[in-house]
Amino acid sequence: MDYCNKKHTAEEYVKISDNNYVPFPEAFSDGGITWQLLHSSPETSSWTAIFNCPAGSSFASHIHAGPGEYFLTKGKMEVRGGEQEGGSTAYAPSYGFESSGALHGKTFFPVESQFYMTFLGPLNFIDDNGKVIASIGWAEAQGAWLATKNEAA
């Protein structure tokens, strides 16, 4: 039976300290956020990255087309305006789950922070009117990472 002879996807190991963080695209962030793409998976439409977020930095408004999970390893992250505006505030160390369709206005980091996140499906960045301006899935994340990594080399 041919379906049993599918090619096995190779395992991966990434030693984070062996790679340089590169700037996350400024069109989707503010304040100098850097990142490393750790894995992209066409077979599951997922991508995993680690982000360094300086104090005062933020991600632009976006919608999670698919669910995502994060682990805040350092700092503080205010989602949907933080607790003071009815959203969530994560304090390290913290785990979070983002459901499909979750709408986030600016995600803000009031102190130096770092988090690891796996996205299942694309992240849709939106303008002030809620119109999607960019959809970042595994292929786009991989392309941005490779382009920026090659520029930095």
Curated annotation (Swiss-Prot):
Catalytic activity: acetylacetone + O2 = methylglyoxal + acetate + H(+)
Subunit text: Homotetramer.
Taxon lineage: Bacteria, Pseudomonadati, Pseudomonadota, Gammaproteobacteria, Moraxellales
EC assignment: 1.13.11.50
Name of the protein in question: Acetylacetone-cleaving enzyme
Gene Ontology terms, MF aspect: acetylacetone-cleaving enzyme activity; metal ion binding
Role description: Cleaves acetylacetone to equimolar amounts of methylglyoxal and acetate, consuming one equivalent of molecular oxygen.
Gene3D superfamilies: Jelly Rolls
Pathway where it operates: Xenobiotic degradation; acetylacetone degradation
Top EC class of this enzyme: oxidoreductase
Primary gene name: dke1
Keywords, in A-Z order: Dioxygenase, Iron, Metal-binding, Oxidoreductase
Cofactor(s) essential for the protein: Fe cation
InterPro entries to which the protein is assigned, alphabetical: ChrR-like_cupin_dom, RmlC-like_jellyroll, RmlC_Cupin_sf
